[in-house]
Amino acid sequence: MIKLYLTPNTRAGRVAWLLEELKIEYEVEILPFTKEGLKSPEHRSRHALGRVPVIEDGDVSIFESGAIIQYLLDKYDNKGLKPNAESKEYPYYLQWFHYCEGMVMPPMNQIVVQTILLPEERRDETVLKQAMNLLTKSLNPVNDYLEGKDYLIGNFSAADCMLGHSCYCLLYTSDAADDRNC
């Protein structure tokens, strides 16, 4: 059985979402967002930097949400959540699958750092405002592309899990920024 190590409100949500879509049985171990949870020697044996998500699938232990999702699709996709490489949808699937980590998550990470992770005295309003502006610019093409569509490539795919989860994370990221009047 697959074991998913996660901390709530992290990229591990993408992996859990895909596992649910694929109807794969899995076990969850929730690690607290603390030094004892993520930086423990036990967890660092799974991920040297003490990050999540990590899955264990038999002898395989793999981290990074995109890599995990690709692995799960290649091994277990029985729902067609990844188009065939020869299909006309495939290039767009790849584009949107990777867009979230390349364009959406970098400014979101800065917003989280500036509103949640850093102590108040180390936060920089200029960095926060720049990140908010970049995030808006990064989301505009997504909004435009999805106009009149339900999904990124016609039917629901793993690209929707990747990018959709990033958009879901905006709910708590935006709340943190709103609390600071950004």
Predicted regions mapped to residue ranges:
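GST-like domain detector, emphasizing the conserved glutathione-binding G-site
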Residues: 1-129, 133-136
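Hydrophobic transmembrane-helix microenvironments that flank and shape a buried ionizable site
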Residues: 61, 98, 157, 175-176
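GST superfamily/GST-like fold recognition
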Residues: 107-110, 151-171
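Hydrophobic alpha-helical bundle segments that form small-molecule/ligand-binding pockets
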Residues: 139-153
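Single conserved hydrophobic/aromatic residue that forms the stacking wall/gate
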Residues: 172-182
